[in-house]
A protein has these predicted regions:
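Bacterial N-terminal signal peptides
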Residues: 13-22
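A generic signature of intrinsically disordered, low-complexity regions enriched in glycine/proline
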Residues: 6-9, 21, 46
């Protein structure tokens, strides 16, 4: 009798858990967030996104700008730094608008099936979304077919990130 009750309790708990997680699993496969946070961290494991560069500056200034430790916001398991209070406020209001695609990893690398770090000065904005790349050579390849690489990366991000 105890075994049956335990099984029923476990099954009930499992069903409730799946019901709670189900909507998240049904969400679009590609987003800028990453599951569980940490995707945006720099390779030195400091938990600082984009190596301390201001994500809003790519859109407002048209170039990478180093953020300040005076303007910091934690989001999705990483610390984001900003060049100004205005940029910090913009990010807080719409983080998904300013955060880089594919969790901040190299967009070309994701398209090719690899999780690769980035250099903040290798970037592009396509359809109001920020894409970062590994280095100048990779950026050249990326720029030859941005739409094609975005399509490939969108289709493979979830499987690549789980490797």
């Amino acid at each position: 009798m105890n075994i049956m009750n335990s099984i029923k309790r476990f099954a009930g708990t499992l069903l409730l858990s799946l019901a709670a997680v189900g909507p998240a699993l049904a969400a679009p496969a590609i987003n800028t967030f990453g599951e569980g946070g940490g995707y945006f961290s720099d390779p030195k494991r400091t938990d600082t996104a984009i190596r301390g560069y201001d994500p809003v500056a790519y859109f407002t200034d048209g170039k990478p700008v180093k953020g300040s430790d005076k303007f910091v916001h934690e989001w999705m398991g990483a610390k984001w730094q900003f060049a100004s209070q205005d940029h910090l406020d913009k990010f807080k209001a719409e983080p998904a608008k300013y955060a880089p695609q594919y969790g901040g990893y190299c967009a070309y690398g994701i398209a090719e099936g690899h999780v690769v770090k980035i250099e903040p000065d290798q970037w592009s904005i396509v359809n109001d979304k920020l894409y970062l790349n590994y280095d100048a050579d990779v950026s050249k390849k990326w720029k030859q077919d941005k739409a094609g690489y975005i399509k490939k990366a969108d289709a493979s991000f979830d499987s690549v990130i789980k490797k």
